[in-house]
Amino acid sequence: MATKNLAEDPYEKLANAIIVQASKDYMSNLRKKKRNPGSASAEHDIKECERFFRSGWYQVLTSVDGEYLMNRLRKEALGTK
């Protein structure tokens, strides 16, 4: 009986791709807001990403804590410790 390799599961790949794209979007908008603090579009997109990372849909896609991930992404995007 063959074992299932989750790394090759197309649904797992899709879930990972969704999270990776949301992470890139979040970091990009954090940097945009840092360069231009008055950017309403960056603020809107940041809130949208944060809503996703706190959503039930996010929890279906991964077991990684959304708050933990947002904190890590913020530190990386803004160069803070």
Regions found by a protein language model. Give the residues of each.
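N-terminal acidic leader/helix
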Residues: A2-S39
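Short intrinsically disordered terminal tails
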Residues: M1, L78-K81
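Short, charge-rich amphipathic interface segments used for partner binding and complex assembly
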Residues: A40-L78
